[in-house]
Amino acid sequence: MNLVSEKEFLDLPLVSVAEIVRCRGPKVSVFPFDGTRRWFHLECNPQYDDYQQAALRQSIRILKMLFEHGIETVISPIFSDDLLDRGDRYIVQALEGMALLANDEEILSFYKEHEVHVLFYGDYKKRLPSTAQGAAVVKSFDDLTISTSSNTEHRLCFGVFGNDAAESVAQFSISWNETHGKPPTRREIIEGYYGEYVDKADMFIGFGRFSTFDFPLLSSGKTSLYFTVAPSYYMTETTLRRILYDHIYLRHFRPKPDYSAMSADQLNVLRNRYRAQPDRVFGVGCVHDGIWFAEG
């Protein structure tokens, strides 16, 4: 692989970056939209602006950016069990936001324009139908998956209660064994959970605290983890390209170093780098006004 500098990569035309990404990865990226209400209160006027519409526009902007940079499949967790602790009012607002994903004209046009097949995963079919509003959302999800099934350029998997797949996988495996007389393969389990087979995640782009979540069965030791300092809606093309550059050129496609073949000078540089910062830890943070920030 010809190694270009980060500056050269940042300056490449979009079509060139997309070609590199399609050829060399990443194919599957996890991008949860996190810190969205914080962004809204900082960048919008809560008295006049509508949170749902503002969030939807930003989500479309970022999804468009990811797809236009050559990423084929985006996994986007949008609602987890822990959000239930925020109360009934938040849940109602969340349901309204979820409904927009399947009904809003702007995002439907986005799916069509970018040839996006939309799928939903998680325990939403068990958890949402307890109310009429929730049942309507589930139906709209199913209808959207069917109506976009002919789109083959990109895939977008929204996670709703997708934090733990253990029970779903167990029930699916029992049913599969009863029907086919044998346990399902890994591929069949993933198809059953996500609606289609999805490769293991190449990278996860989170915000704030260093933790991954809500993409069951797809994590591996080769999943590159990235965490932005600012909430997800602050994502820029420069930020994304820096992440792509690191993933493609710096992490996985270089030969493993042979320490026995290193010169004394090379070993000294490495030793001095480690000795200069033995107490530095990525993931350690501080709290200001009740908000956690990364340090290090």
Swiss-Prot record:
- What is the enzyme's class at the highest EC level? transferase
Recorded superkingdom = Bacteria
Q: What does this protein do?
A: Tuberculosinyl transferase that catalyzes the condensation of adenosine and tuberculosinyl diphosphate (TbPP) to generate 1-tuberculosinyladenosine (1-TbAd), which acts as an antiacid that directly protects M.tuberculosis from acid pH and physically remodels M.tuberculosis phagolysosomes. In addition, acts as a phosphatase that catalyzes the diphosphate-removal from TbPP to produce both tuberculosinol (TOH) and isotuberculosinol (iso-TOH). Has broad substrate specificity, and can also use the 3 labdadienyl diphosphates, copalyl diphosphate (CDP), ent-CDP and syn-CDP in vitro.
Recorded E.C. number(s)?
2.5.1.153
Name the keywords, alphabetized.
Transferase, Virulence
Consequence when changing residue 85 to N:
Significant decrease in phosphatase activity. Loss of phosphatase activity
State the remark under miscellaneous.
1-TbAd is highly prevalent among patient-derived M.tuberculosis strains, where it is among the most abundant lipids produced.
Question: What is the source species?
Answer: Mycobacterium tuberculosis (strain ATCC 25618 / H37Rv)
Question: What is known to happen upon mutating residue 51 to F?
Answer: Strong decrease in TOH and iso-TOH production. Almost loss of TOH and TOH production
Q: How does it assemble?
A: Homodimer.
Activity regulation: the record says:
Inhibited by the bisphosphonate inhibitor BPH-629.
Q: Which reaction does it catalyse?
A: tuberculosinyl diphosphate + adenosine + H(+) = 1-tuberculosinyladenosine + diphosphate; tuberculosinyl diphosphate + H2O = tuberculosinol + diphosphate; tuberculosinyl diphosphate + H2O = (13R)-edaxadiene + diphosphate; tuberculosinyl diphosphate + H2O = (13S)-edaxadiene + diphosphate
Taxonomic path: Bacteria, Bacillati, Actinomycetota, Actinomycetes, Mycobacteriales
According to the UniProt record, activity depends on pH as follows: Optimum pH is 7. It is active in a pH range of 5.5-9.0.
Phenotype of the disrupted gene, per the record: Deletion of the gene abolishes 1-TbAd biosynthesis and decreases the formation of swollen phagosomes.
Swapping residue 34 to N leads to an effect described as: Abolishes transferase activity
This chain's protein is named Tuberculosinyl adenosine transferase
Q: Which residues form a coiled coil?
A: none
